């Protein structure tokens, strides 16, 4: 029996694009179930999505992360196609991404955006994405080229083991780190990235959302790499302690006296804080390893992607689709 596919589309005030997105996904994956989760639109997004044939649901808590959390909890399928409702992603790439996930038994296929249009991918967003992708690659592993892509194909065990915490656009960072931390089999496919349709406005605020993503990366480092995080703090504190103590030690070596007691006490206190920080790092590293093992066991409880040997690959090639509702 072929795997079921669900296309899940978070959106907010996308009346100019949502109908085209739904119809495009229906043409690319005609046997899939398409869900549009509205995040409190004030225009005709809900009506347009329903007219296009999507199952429309609402999430009152504002923020893309809240919508993704709700979709992952509500929708049941074997394969999930997550795509933004702004009309910038190429629906025709979906069958290729689904096929790769099934053929190679991957848990995540990321759609790496490629665009030759100057207005499609703003320079600030491009450079910010490159910087954030580099940061995550240095800390968690270099397996993706587009950290903030809103176009992903995921297995059921990826979705149902994902503990969504983010509330906004930083959800993409969490999705990526989830795959990297559990060492899941992943892949990446280049996809065309187009301009938004006329009248559609991006909800991404370059600076504020960029800072939220940076804070998310710092939080994930603290939670997933506590030893490195607290070692860095301990090293900074130890360096400050040594800098404070150095003139006191020189004075003691020269005169045999310690006339600067406040500085000596401060230096000692800072070094104690450094030791405590390092101790916290070791303790939390042990806790994190246990938590990661539990997440891995929960991940393994879910069904794996169906391999191509079950005839799914030929179905995609023949009809541009795999799965049933």
What are these regions (language model features)?
Residues 38-46:
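A conserved acidic beta->alpha catalytic loop
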Residues 59-74, 91-169, 173, 194-211, ...:
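Acceptor/aglycone-binding surface of glycosyltransferases and processive sugar-polymer synthases
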Residues 13-27:
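Short, well-formed alpha-helical segments that are part of the catalytic scaffolds
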Residues 80:
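Short aromatic/hydrophobic "clamp" motif used to bind/position activated sugar donors
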Residues 4-6, 33, 174:
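Cell-envelope/extracellular polymer assembly enzymes that use nucleotide-activated donors
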Residues 1, 165-166, 171-325:
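Hydrophobic helical membrane-anchoring modules
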Residues 84-89:
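The conserved acidic donor/metal-binding loop of glycosyltransferases
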Residues 14-17, 41, 64, 90:
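Donor nucleotide-sugar binding loop of glycosyltransferases
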């Amino acid at each position: 029996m072929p795997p079921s596919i669900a296309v899940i589309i978070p959106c907010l005030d996308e009346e100019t694009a949502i109908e085209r997105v739904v119809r495009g996904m229906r043409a690319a994956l005609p046997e899939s179930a398409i869900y549009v989760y509205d995040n409190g639109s004030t225009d005709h997004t809900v009506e347009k999505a329903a007219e296009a044939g999507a199952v429309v649901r609402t999430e009152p808590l504002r923020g893309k992360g809240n919508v993704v959390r709700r979709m992952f909890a509500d929708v049941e399928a074997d394969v999930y196609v997550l795509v933004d409702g702004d009309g910038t992603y190429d629906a025709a790439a979906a069958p290729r991404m689904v096929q790769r996930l099934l053929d190679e038994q991957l848990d995540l296929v990321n759609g790496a955006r490629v665009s030759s249009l100057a207005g499609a991918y703003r320079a600030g967003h491009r450079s910010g994405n490159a910087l954030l992708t580099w940061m995550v690659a240095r800390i968690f592993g270099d397996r993706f080229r587009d950290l903030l892509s809103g176009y992903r194909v995921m297995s059921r065990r990826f979705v149902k083991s994902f503990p969504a915490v983010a509330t906004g656009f930083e959800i993409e960072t969490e999705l990526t780190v989830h795959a990297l931390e559990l060492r899941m089999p992943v892949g990446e496919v280049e996809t065309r990235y187009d301009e938004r349709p006329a009248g559609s406005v991006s909800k991404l605020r370059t600076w504020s959302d960029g800072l939220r993503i940076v804070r998310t990366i710092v939080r994930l480092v603290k939670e997933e790499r506590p030893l490195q995080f607290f070692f860095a703090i301990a090293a900074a504190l130890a360096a400050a302690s040594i800098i404070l103590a150095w003139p006191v030690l020189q004075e003691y070596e020269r005169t045999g006296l310690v006339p600067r007691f406040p500085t000596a006490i401060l230096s000692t206190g800072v070094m104690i804080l450094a030791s405590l920080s390092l101790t916290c790092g070791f303790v939390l590293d042990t806790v994190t390893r246990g938590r990661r093992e539990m997440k891995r066991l929960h991940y393994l409880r879910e069904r794996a992607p169906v391999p191509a040997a079950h005839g799914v690959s030929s179905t995609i090639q023949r009809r541009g689709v795999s799965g049933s509702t």
